[in-house]
């Protein structure tokens, strides 16, 4: 079992470059304190076009706690928040129950997020869908319920 954390940030246009620099430094802090991987990007579609996002991956909840304890000690996060031009809009924690592909970060250019609801995880259906994705160029994927955050209702999957 592993976990993924998805965080969305709002930044003022004139602060975007500074925010990206700070987020990259925060990424290194999480990697040094328990994260097994991290990706930074910008949403290109949907209701939040232009928002910065970070995906972090962890082996267990204890590693999430260690990474976030280290982030709270960093003056970088405080600096960004005190600027008034940077804020965290949204954070969800996903329990990964199905993981597929190679996760080769150098090859990935895009990430596709799909959020859906179901009464059960439907792992057989997801497994078949993962085969379709990888046979058509997908490098990797993770699937599971959102366990912490606004959509943690036991029926919402990412």
Regions found by a protein language model. Name each.
Residues 1-158:
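Short S/T/G/P-rich N-terminal loop/turn motif that feeds into the first structured element of a domain
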């Amino acid at each position: 079992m592993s976990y993924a954390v998805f965080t969305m940030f709002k930044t003022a246009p004139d602060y975007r470059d500074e925010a990206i620099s700070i987020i990259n430094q925060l990424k290194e802090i999480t990697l040094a304190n328990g994260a097994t991987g991290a990706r930074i990007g910008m949403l290109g579609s949907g209701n939040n076009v232009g928002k910065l996002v970070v995906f972090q991956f962890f082996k267990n909840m204890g590693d999430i706690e260690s990474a976030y304890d280290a982030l709270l000690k960093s003056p970088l996060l405080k600096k960004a928040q005190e600027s008034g031009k940077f804020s965290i809009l949204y954070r969800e924690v996903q329990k990964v129950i199905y993981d597929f592909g190679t996760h080769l970060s150098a090859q990935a250019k895009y990430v596709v997020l799909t959020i859906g609801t179901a009464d059960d995880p439907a792992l057989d259906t997801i497994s078949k869908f993962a085969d379709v994705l990888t046979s058509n160029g997908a490098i990797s994927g993770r699937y599971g319920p959102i366990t912490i955050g606004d959509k943690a209702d036991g029926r919402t999957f990412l």
